[in-house]
């Protein structure tokens, strides 16, 4: 009775995922049918988790040679440090291992300084290498050292400021979340003749470090893990029905194949050549019929009679209902049970 609380609620059998132009960044994910009200419940919960709770990587601080604080300007650089830091915050990063990691950028002008100019470090990948960080004039030079770490959600620059940080190390606002945008809508949908069900549509954009489909999967796992504490009972165990062999009009031992009997090679080959497959086929043969089998002699006959006698069987028996229509299936089930 208690299981009906959750077992009898309708739930979607699978998700319908439609990738966008860039399948690593954009996707529309549809779940249907859902019980009335569950579209809003799940959509709102998943959206909040997608935006706030997934792990990602981001720059936490930057050191620029010759710069003491963010309200400075750099000779030969068109942007001031405040603008440079705003651009740095937009660098999308994917990091497989744990942080923190150091990354260095060094470039001479003239020209634009891009995120892709940052030197590669092990398992750290820049996902938007064409992002412009700043612009250098002729003869200008810039060197920056970045600190990259992992985390979740949004962390303000003040929280990234270490007490023992050296002079010139500028903390940066860190947006760790790999999900940039999430929207959802709930519509009516049909299941059979019933229209009173929900259809949940999620539209997700990530920074490329995580696919939208994986982002939803991880978010659902987080929600599942948080809800486990509210389940204060053990689910009653289901009694699994044990499949049984149906009532047979004959001894089920007749479904055993003759090649499983301990016969000599000569006797086994004679039965095989005469297309005798099951014991049920064999016992309906008379002694005279067996002796007419090519290469089958009295010695083989006596051997077979002895083996059958040990099973309480003999040649020349009449078997009602043999052979059954589904003999191969019955033989397999017999093998599993006996």
Swiss-Prot record:
Residues 250-338 are annotated as: Alpha C-terminal domain (alpha-CTD). DNA-dependent RNA polymerase catalyzes the transcription of DNA into RNA using the four ribonucleoside triphosphates as substrates. Its EC number is 2.7.7.6. This is DNA-directed RNA polymerase subunit alpha. HAMAP family: RNApol_bact_RpoA (MF_00059). It comes from the Bacteria. Keywords: DNA-directed RNA polymerase, Nucleotidyltransferase, Transcription, Transferase. The N-terminal domain is essential for RNAP assembly and basal transcription, whereas the C-terminal domain is involved in interaction with transcriptional regulators and with upstream promoter elements. Belongs to the RNA polymerase alpha chain family. Gene3D superfamilies: 5' to 3' exonuclease, C-terminal subdomain, DNA-directed RNA polymerase, insert domain, RNA polymerase, RBP11-like subunit. It comes from Beijerinckia indica subsp. indica (strain ATCC 9039 / DSM 1715 / NCIMB 8712). The lineage of its organism: Bacteria, Pseudomonadati, Pseudomonadota, Alphaproteobacteria, Hyphomicrobiales. InterPro entries: DNA-dir_RNA_pol_insert, DNA-dir_RNA_pol_RpoA/D/Rpb3, DNA-dir_RpoA, RBP11-like, RNAP_asu_C, RNApol_insert_sf. GO terms for cellular component: cytoplasm; DNA-directed RNA polymerase complex. Residues 1-234 are annotated as: Alpha N-terminal domain (alpha-NTD).
């Amino acid at each position: 009775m208690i299981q009906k609380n959750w077992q009898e609620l309708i739930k979607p059998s699978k998700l319908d995922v439609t990738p966008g132009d860039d399948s690593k960044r954009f996707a529309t994910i549809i779940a249907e049918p859902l019980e009335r009200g569950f579209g809003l419940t799940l959509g709102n919960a998943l959206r909040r988790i997608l935006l706030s709770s997934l792990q990602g990587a981001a720059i936490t601080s930057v050191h620029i040679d010759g710069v003491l604080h963010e309200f400075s300007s750099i000779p030969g650089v068109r942007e001031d440090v405040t603008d440079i830091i705003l651009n740095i915050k937009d660098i999308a990063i994917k990091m497989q291992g744990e942080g923190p990691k150091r990354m260095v950028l060094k470039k001479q002008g003239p020209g634009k300084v891009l995120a892709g100019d940052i030197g590669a470090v092990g398992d750290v990948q820049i996902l938007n290498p064409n992002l412009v960080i700043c612009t250098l004039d002729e003869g200008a030079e810039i060197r920056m050292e970045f600190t990259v770490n992992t985390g979740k959600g949004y962390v303000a620059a003040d929280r990234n400021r270490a007490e023992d940080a050296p002079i010139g190390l500028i903390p940066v606002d860190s947006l760790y979340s790999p999900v940039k945008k999430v929207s959802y809508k709930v519509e009516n949908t049909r299941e059979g003749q019933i229209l009173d069900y929900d259809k949940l549509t999620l539209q997700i954009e990530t920074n490329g470090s995580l696919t939208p489909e994986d982002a939803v999967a991880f978010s659902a796992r987080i929600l599942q893990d948080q809800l486990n504490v509210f389940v204060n009972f053990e689910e009653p165990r289901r009694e699994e029905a044990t499949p049984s062999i149906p009532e047979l009009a004959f001894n089920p031992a007749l479904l055993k194949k003759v090649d499983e009997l301990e016969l000599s090679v000569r006797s086994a080959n004679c039965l095989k050549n005469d297309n005798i497959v099951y014991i049920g086929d064999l016992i309906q043969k008379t002694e005279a019929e067996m002796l007419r089998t090519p290469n089958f002699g009295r010695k083989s006959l006596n051997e077979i009679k002895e083996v059958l006698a040990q099973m309480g069987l003999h040649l020349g028996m009449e078997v009602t209902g043999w052979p059954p229509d589904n003999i191969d299936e019955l033989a397999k089930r017999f093998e599993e049970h006996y």
